[in-house]
């Protein structure tokens, strides 16, 4: 927080506690949820001035946290793992002091293709144009790790480093064969493609998921239920990472406790901001 008032302003109330919340892009799930969280904190913790800001999502948010530019950040637990261990995009740049405040909901690694591609399994990716996410992003690490579980390396495919917005357009235009997107489902961008095209979600088979989890403990298995997307008539097995709220060890315990208490006492406000919050449990 910030220091107290100066001498001549004794009549003013105690200094406000500014809480900056790092979210993600304005079209994602973090941004509306961050706005809802700011609202909850402002209404439930006296003297708090909380605000959400749009950012470049998980990787950027870890850096904002470690630089002290924000107090709370929405991040994926896999990115937190890389930061704490100094691996992947944090190789040689280990971040000390990251702490989890709350685990929110699963972010499903969704592998999207169109029916006409003929792709039914990740094993079919050889020689195909695959959008793996922006270079150095969490999605890209997910894509690489899942393909690795199937014995497929970047050399075996035509790698396209595209954000999911770009990948969605490329899929529709026939410029990529499949794309990875890591986001709470249902994901608006996939729903959008599915209204005009026959979308197929490529599963991650149970044995491959088990191998993945053994190597990368931040993954969990889940099912994308039939009917999640237009014309999706069967359940699809998938893996997910988790969205979490992270702080640093600079935040005092009382503040952290007050934030968690306010959040869990007002989950309805989070749920009204985005349906992904329906999966948050106390």
Task: Annotate each predicted stretch with a short phrase.
Residues 11-126, 131-134:
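Short, glycine-/small- and polar/acidic-enriched structural segments
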Residues 16-18, 42-54, 148-162, 175-178, ...:
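A local structural motif
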Residues 236-282:
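Segments of small-molecule ligand-sensing domains
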């Amino acid at each position: 927080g910030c220091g107290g008032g100066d001498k001549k302003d004794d009549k003013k109330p105690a200094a406000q506690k500014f809480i900056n919340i790092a979210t993600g892009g304005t079209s994602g799930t973090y941004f509306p949820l961050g706005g809802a969280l700011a609202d909850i904190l402002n209404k439930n913790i006296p003297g708090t001035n909380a605000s959400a800001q749009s950012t470049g999502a998980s990787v950027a948010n870890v850096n904002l946290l470690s630089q002290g530019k924000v107090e709370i950040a929405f991040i994926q637990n896999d990115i937190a793992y890389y930061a704490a261990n100094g691996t992947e995009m944090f190789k040689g740049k280990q971040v000390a002091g990251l702490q989890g405040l709350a685990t929110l909901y699963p972010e499903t690694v969704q592998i999207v293709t169109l029916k006409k591609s003929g792709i039914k399994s990740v094993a079919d990716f050889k020689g195909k144009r695959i959008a793996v996410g922006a270079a150095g992003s969490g999605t890209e690490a997910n894509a690489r790790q899942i393909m690795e579980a199937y014995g497929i390396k970047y050399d075996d495919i035509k790698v396209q480093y595209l954000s999911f917005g770009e990948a969605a357009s490329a899929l529709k235009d026939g410029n990529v064969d499949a794309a990875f997107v890591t986001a709470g489902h249902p994901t608006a961008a996939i729903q959008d493609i599915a209204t005009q095209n026959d979308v197929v979600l490529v599963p991650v088979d149970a044995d491959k998921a088990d191998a993945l989890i053994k190597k990368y403990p931040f993954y969990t298995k889940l099912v994308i239920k039939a009917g999640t997307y237009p014309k999706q008539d069967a359940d699809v097995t998938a893996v997910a990472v988790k969205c979490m709220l992270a702080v640093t060890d600079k935040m005092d315990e009382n503040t952290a406790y007050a934030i968690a208490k306010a959040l869990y006492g007002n989950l309805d406000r989070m749920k009204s901001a985005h349906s992904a919050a329906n999966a948050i449990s106390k």
